[in-house]
Amino acid sequence: MKVVVIIPARYGSTRFEAKPLALIAGKPMIQRVYERAAAASSVTGVAVATDDERIVSAVEKFGGKAVMTSDACRSGTDRVFEAGRTLGLTGSDIVVNVQGDQPVFDPECIDEVTAPLIGDPGTGMTTLAFAIVNEREMTDPKDVKMVFDQDGWALYFSRATIPHDRDGNMEFDTYKHLGVYAYTMDFLAEFCSLPEGHLEKIEKLEQLRALEYGLGIKTVVTAYDSPEVDLPEDIARIEALLKDQ
């Protein structure tokens, strides 16, 4: 069984053009994500999946591996699946999808998210949740919230605050979804064959496709947050976090 991290990376963006190549404390953001992924103990390989030669060039410059994918991929997950096939991954081989805008994530997150699949490939798909400590993230639609059952299976993901405390007198954690997924190649093949879901279209969240079609997502609660770079002004905050590490 192989465990390969694939980092989908797009050059074009309406909010942040060339984001993967933005410098974070002197290194391209994609390099920082790549290096952290490679540091996970469970990983047997790392690759960047992109449709842009500029990103391929940047990755190869720091000694990384890049896979060119079609520019017709409808989502980052489809791009990851295409790259996985190009890399020769099949069956119960595990693909870890790490978003390319998380330059300070802890490598332990990859070991945590892959553990259920390594133990039981029939699990299919896993992801991470983090108990929110910053109140702003409770209501910010950029931070996706999630709920899961007593066995850790995801029930829903939303940009809204869930669950809603109607009476305002309950003590409970609100969980933020972190953009790290692991799947078997068999699961990815099924997922990518499905039409876009109705809830997926509304919330603009790919993972809802799995839930809408009855495919389970096992949730692992992690102690490690994974702040994202959404806009250029986020870089200073990320660089400050790097100094503290």
Swiss-Prot record:
Q: EC number(s)?
A: 2.7.7.38
Question: Mind telling me which InterPro entries this protein's record contains?
Answer: Cytidylyl_trans, KdsB, Nucleotide-diphossugar_trans
* Enzyme class label: transferase
Keyword Flavoprotein listed? The answer is no
Q: Which reaction does it catalyse?
A: 3-deoxy-alpha-D-manno-oct-2-ulosonate + CTP = CMP-3-deoxy-beta-D-manno-octulosonate + diphosphate
Output a single Gene Ontology CC term carried by this record. cytosol
Which CDD domains does the record cross-reference, listed alphabetically? CMP-KDO-Synthetase
Specify the pathway.
Answer: Nucleotide-sugar biosynthesis; CMP-3-deoxy-D-manno-octulosonate biosynthesis; CMP-3-deoxy-D-manno-octulosonate from 3-deoxy-D-manno-octulosonate and CTP: step 1/1; Bacterial outer membrane biogenesis; lipopolysaccharide biosynthesis
> Where, per UniProt, does this protein localize?
Cytoplasm
Origin superkingdom: Bacteria
What keywords appear on the UniProt entry?
Answer: Cytoplasm, Lipopolysaccharide biosynthesis, Nucleotidyltransferase, Transferase
Which Pfam families does this one have?
A: CTP_transf_3
Molecular function (GO) terms for this protein are: 3-deoxy-manno-octulosonate cytidylyltransferase activity
Name the Gene Ontology biological process terms: CMP-keto-3-deoxy-D-manno-octulosonic acid biosynthetic process; lipopolysaccharide biosynthetic process
Instruction: Sum up the protein's function in the record's words.
Output: Activates KDO (a required 8-carbon sugar) for incorporation into bacterial lipopolysaccharide in Gram-negative bacteria.
Query: What is stated as this protein's family in its record?
Result: Belongs to the KdsB family.
Query: What name appears for this protein in its UniProt entry?
Result: 3-deoxy-manno-octulosonate cytidylyltransferase
Species per Swiss-Prot/TrEMBL record: Desulfatibacillum aliphaticivorans
Its taxonomic path starts at:
Bacteria, Pseudomonadati, Thermodesulfobacteriota, Desulfobacteria, Desulfobacterales
